[in-house]
């Protein structure tokens, strides 16, 4: 089985072809990604209209390249999948419309994929992990701990009550005068700084419910920065290091609470999976490795290029759904908000 996946929910335009081999293993045949960082850098963040226009300009070319790299023709595909949300509605419509047109033209099944579900299932493509497992989803727009029990079967254990982790990184970077995107810049500066200089709060620490709250931490960084007259590079590095240390401690504490709740509500946990762009942060990956080793839990960290948005994860989620006979019709609309919960109506779309 071979599926084309299209991703346009934010500021990456992506197309990929993934193959399901005999025995159930997935194989990435092509994975084309075009970032829009340069287009948005001057604004310090993603501008929805610019993002949508950029998707329109490059998507057809990326799809053609993905098919060429995979050495496959459109007619040889078994299905065409596209991220239908959550995300910026203009961009989602671009990818969704393109996928529907290709599916109609080639008489292939169309699969509407939840972008968050695609992140959740990536570890099954890279590592073949069995259900159930604990997902830590950390990106610019989402921070959640989710019990992944099956395709379309998710239990959200905890989430952020305000800022997502990636959003906090970007906002701290902006207030400290660092370049966009902020996550890699904060990590780069943190490597040079003293993580103990500033005693920033660890929000929600010790609470039984594994929710996150980062607005207070973000405010603490702003206050500390404002108290320093003309911060030097050393000051900025120390602020970044102290902020990142607080984030790491918070994520470990919240993950511990999430694992405890998983075992109470679901049972044995086969692994902890990290997904989303923030999962590429080296300090976070090292801390989670230690946490899982101490907890006797297998940790799955997909390659950094599969943590950020990509078409391969959409194609794989399409394969997972198509394997169960779940396809969608051409009336499926973009869903800028689309929760990843087992009791949400949107989690059970598709018809067998």
UniProtKB/Swiss-Prot annotation:
InterPro entries: ATPase_NBD (IPR043129), Gcp-like_dom (IPR000905), KAE1/TsaD (IPR017861), TsaD (IPR022450). Keywords: Acyltransferase, Cytoplasm, Iron, Metal-binding, Transferase, tRNA processing. Binds 1 Fe(2+) ion per subunit. Substrate binds at residues 137-141, 170, 183, 281. Transmembrane segments: none annotated. Required for the formation of a threonylcarbamoyl group on adenosine at position 37 (t(6)A37) in tRNAs that read codons beginning with adenine. Is involved in the transfer of the threonylcarbamoyl moiety of threonylcarbamoyl-AMP (TC-AMP) to the N6 group of A37, together with TsaE and TsaB. TsaD likely plays a direct catalytic role in this reaction. This is tRNA N6-adenosine threonylcarbamoyltransferase. It comes from Methylocella silvestris (strain DSM 15510 / CIP 108128 / LMG 27833 / NCIMB 13906 / BL2). The gene is tsaD.
